[in-house]
């Protein structure tokens, strides 16, 4: 969490005495499978019977990890990382878990967004500020429409590593290892760039620290004050339909603040001058995550201090796999990415492994499966989880199930398909009597042309003009804000008790 004020749960005690892992040399020993990788053959009791440790994941089969050429170099880098200060604090992660527990009960809504993959080359203050600013705008829109607290979580300050469906990439007859994210190897298509370099982990750490430092300054230094709500519009959205709608909403907020001032209610309260902001990323590069895991002296629990929240991806969520083994032992709030391939009983077992105490806010299920599959598959998942008595926060990721190849060869996503999946997500929760707890978006504050559609009608022919992503296509600022208004309208309908009625506009 970014805000640090008098109401923060971070005492002096929780700042200082993190207990680091024992100071023996970190060994990135080869990992191997001791159980079948078939999720259906694993059970919660089998996993729970094995004592967890920082290195217990190494006894499991680990997918999506790079093959480093020099093991001694890797060990040296990991030892250095293990001596570095934590990027985030345990008390912040606990507070996020409490907030997500509210979202699980329909009392809050999570807005999670940011880059598909952060890069070293595009790292600068303006890009960080612009993405943060769009998230602030979206948060205001959602809060105003839903009359709910909005939990703002960035895919920032650590979202580097990316899973790959193929370990190799081929161009013009040349076959090289796939690009796996800037914290592992380079994206340039040459042999040297594609060799995994452990020193990139150190650079990823320093960039994450610098990013979070800037976010903390923006969140607490007055930039995020509600009184600035009308000043957050980006230049290229000001003269658009979404810019006009946002300006109208901002004026209404300004009027409300003016009324509060006239009534003698102070606007100097921290809730009006600062914002809470958390960070998250996919837990993929396990050696890095282990090196940044600390034992919290106030609770005795282990926290992965690389981010407030981590999630396990579709390709690494095997019940008996290394990633699930690592995550079950850390106390951070966790996300589970779920596609149409997820079997209800498997999801229940995975939640049992990761949250045996059934703590609200511990597990967020991030659903990504396309609109048609959403209507067929999600009800069964909700019923299975409810039948098991498990408490989770349901979140829609309308991005990953809607990636297509444009005629020109660029990956893209259709705004209409994204909206359709969100509509299906809300419809299913209305039907099942459950709570839509949030949205997870790949987006940027930059004026890119990577997703087609939206009110500005980006076409296939427009894609190449400002296509800057290192990985998957992202919503630009205008499209992100447009989506926020659509979601806010649906939240408003739920608030007014008419969420089950068909909508003529929006979702």
Swiss-Prot record:
Q: Where primarily located?
A: plastid
**What domain of life is recorded for the organism?**
Eukaryota
GO annotation, cellular component aspect: chloroplast; chloroplast thylakoid; plasma membrane
The EC designation for this entry is 2.5.1.54
Question: Which InterPro entries does this chain map to?
Answer: Aldolase_TIM, DAHP_synth_2
**Record's Gene3D superfamilies?**
Aldolase class I
Among the Pfam families in the record, one is DAHP_synth_2
Report the record's disulfide bonds. Answer: none
Provide the family line.
Belongs to the class-II DAHP synthase family.
Name the chain's protein: Phospho-2-dehydro-3-deoxyheptonate aldolase 2, chloroplastic
The organism is Arabidopsis thaliana
What's the source species' lineage?
Eukaryota, Viridiplantae, Streptophyta, Embryophyta, Tracheophyta
Gene name of the record: DHS2
